[in-house]
Amino acid sequence: MEEWLLIAFDSTQQALRAEMLLEYADIEIDLCPTPKGVTAGCSLSIQFPAEDYTEVQRIIETEQVEIRGIYFKKESEYVRMEK
């Protein structure tokens, strides 16, 4: 089973901007509701394959996308990744 990571945002504008940038980079993403266990100012999150983490991080930093954090799922909860 492929592992997916989750990006949480503080604003819908930043979530939609990230969606556009990641799709343009041909990264497989899924726009989804922010899980209850993740504190964020926006109800939208983006899931992406863990194998694309380095490229996603590069795009976020280069394009100065404001995010709350990137999370991985451990058992039934989400854990924030360190930068």
Predicted regions and their residues:
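Short N-terminal helix-initiation segments at or just after the protein's N-terminus
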Residues: S11-A15, E19, E66, M81-K83
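C-terminal structural segments of small proteins and small subunits
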Residues: A50-K83
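Amphipathic, hydrophobic secondary-structure cores in small proteins
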Residues: L6, T12, L16, L21-E23, ...
